[in-house]
A protein has these predicted regions:
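Positively charged n-region of N-terminal signal peptides that target proteins for export
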Residues: 1-4
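Bacterial N-terminal signal peptides
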Residues: 8-18
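A short, N-terminal "cap"/entry segment at the start of jelly-roll beta-barrel domains
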Residues: 20-65, 152-160
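Double-stranded beta-helix
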Residues: 30, 106, 126-160
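N-terminal post-signal-peptidase region of extra-cytosolic proteins
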Residues: 52-55, 66-79
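Short acidic-glycine-tyrosine-enriched beta hairpin
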Residues: 58-60, 95, 101-122
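Glycine- and acidic-residue-biased ligand/ion/polar-headgroup-sensing regions
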Residues: 72-75, 81-102
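Short beta-strand His + acidic residue motifs that chelate non-heme Fe in jelly-roll/DSBH
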Residues: 77-79, 97-98, 119, 124-130
Length: 160
């Protein structure tokens, strides 16, 4: 009897843990048709020319976020890093990524639509839209981007 009761109690604790873990992941499902996405200016750490939409979550807060960045051909993001892992999926166009602290087009890898990259926390990297396109970025917030060379940071606070 005691073994059965302990086993049942253990099962309840495990099941509650699974339920709470699933509930912590999201407040509900998210489905978005492309026409429903609202595009606007990205955070000021991105150079002018790109637009961004938040697909889910809130990149300014702790927790999972998904954003999309729409860039014209030739748009560059100078060498930088993030304190958390960054997952990048190319939705359309060709997106080029390079690793290191110096922007070097010759060493970049082209990712076509459907391409994916995982950029671990602290990894120095840079990017360029080889053609006009959209990338989807997801990670754990709050989103932060630190330029290797502070002079590359286009945000107003960078000049202070």
């Amino acid at each position: 009897m005691k073994k059965t009761l302990l086993w049942a109690l253990g099962l309840v604790v495990v099941m509650l843990g699974v339920v709470f873990a699933q509930g912590a992941a999201t407040d509900g499902h998210v489905m978005s048709a492309p026409k429903d996405l609202k595009w606007g200016e990205p955070p000021p750490v991105f150079a002018k020319g790109a637009t961004m939409t938040v697909v889910s979550g809130d990149p300014s807060k702790e927790g999972l976020y998904v954003v999309r960045l729409k860039m014209p051909a030739g748009y560059q993001i100078k060498p930088h890093w993030h304190p958390t892992d960054e997952h990048v999926t190319v939705i359309s166009g060709t997106f080029s990524l390079g690793m290191g602290e110096k922007f070097d087009k010759a060493t970049m890898t082209d990712l076509p639509a459907g391409g994916y990259a995982l950029l671990p926390a602290q990894m120095r990297h840079y990017a360029m839209a080889k053609t006009a396109g959209i990338v989807q970025v997801h990670g754990m917030g709050p989103f932060q981007l630190t330029y290797v060379n502070p002079a590359d940071d286009p945000s107003p606070h960078a000049s202070q």
